[in-house]
Amino acid sequence: MRVLVANSQDDFRVKAYAGTNGVLLAMDLAEPRRKGLLGFAIEKQQGDKPWQFLFNSLTFPGKAHTFPQFHATPSDIAPLQKFRWADYAVYPGTTMHYRVHLAYGTADAPVLGESLELSITSDDGHPANQSVIFNRAVAASQAFQRKFPDLDAQISANKNMPIEAWPDAARQWLENGLLGRLQGFIERAVDGQWALDIAIYEYQLQAIIDTVNAAFDRGVQVRVLYHAKPGDEDTTMNEASLAKLPDTSKRGRVTHDIFHDKFIVLSHIAGGERQPQAVLCGSTNFTANGVYRQANVVHVLDDTAIAASYLQTFEQVWATPADVGATRDWITQHNPMNPAQPLFAGFSPRSGGADLRAFVDIINAAKKDVLFVTAFTLPDAILNALLGQPHDDILRYGLQNTVSRITGFHADRTAEFAATALLNTGLEGWLKENMKGQKGNLLVHTKAIVTDFTSDNPTIISGSHNLSAAASNGNDENFLIIRGDTELADRYGLELLRFYEHYRFRYFAKKLALKQVQPLAADDSWTNDYYVEGDLRQLSRLRFAGR
């Protein structure tokens, strides 16, 4: 959801973008009005709660924080000196009210001037035909510490405490409804008139296993294709998890690569035939790691054509589960890349790398911005497209990550920064210990790109595909390319920016501790770069505000 408010002269405006768990506020001010501007003071109100000023982690020179326990000061005392601000203390389906004030005066006595007010509602994750939900996972560690201080201290002291021993509230907060969305999709198959076809890399979380077994027990036609690499530990665990299903309901995908799919097709049975109704896909493996620890997405489409393409691919693998070559030939022939359509479902393995070329073309076609979260091992063509040319005019905000390493890109490939992936205490210390020996080396497992987020014609790439050569020609993978859907782009874009801002903040927090970050400017000099023609900060100010 997007809301734009401006004064009658349109020399002061605020554009808001709402995702599922965040709101982004982008401000713009005409150049003559920036004289003496100390920043923006932002108030927030929701429900029947009082209006409150949002906090700033920076203060004016020589000023102590008014809330030292949070290392923060309200923004009417320490105005926010940036033209974009994100609020991630947001729940799905909630209406938020914001007031953005211009702050002038002096560092000793800021004076609030003109203000703009807006209301915006976060996505509830339940739109008619397409919904996405993200767990909170690692990038919510600061909020976790504030919400569950006792548990945070407990898991700091006992890093091997199993997540099953956690209080329900903390566990549910971490998965953020993602597990319920998975289970709810399975439960839509109510009886023998329904079928569930499941393609999964890691089938190990008991809550999901129990939900699938319950569907089978009520007569649902269940088939499970699972990763079955010879001599592989995951294969052994998958087969143990499938013990209650008969052999006719399960087949191992025998591969020397990875059966990396994680999708479920829901079909209605009519005349003995499956009539596909919906598909659940995304990046989430059916493990504690996938649901609670790694950052992941579940994407549900109530789209019969897309569900049919997933079912066709499932049927091909089901028919010849030990013949990866046959699948590769079939996908190459029957799933040609057609990324120009509004909604495209792609699969691999395929020959020739057409999927990778399509990704490069989409990224290179971006006119305004590129948001991304990826792994490190990318083909040069993909990496060069994501990072662009030094000092080009495309805004780039992204992360490359493993469990131990985070590299971020701030507006331009020349502004690379590195942040600590996991701290040693609290939720992150627990995650660090509990991800040891886990399959998969990504902390942020969501694999997604959004191009031209700030425009009315964004493009989203999302799925299990990690943009690598192996994902193109070796692994079984699936992905979606979605064009022109601003509502969906807001959900993905805000989530990618949440990861980005979390690690950007961590990078600055470290510099702050080392006294390498300047305090707030006591005058309007902080605005200078935002008004230099062609500077990336100027482009950011204009584009995010809808200019």
Residue spans for each PLM region:
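PLD/PLD-like phosphodiesterase catalytic module centered on the HKD motif
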Residues: 1-168, 179, 183, 194, ...
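Short, surface-exposed alpha-helical recognition segments that flank or form part
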Residues: 75, 169-177, 199-200, 347
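Short, Φ-rich (hydrophobic/aromatic) sequence segments
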Residues: 186-189, 314, 362-364
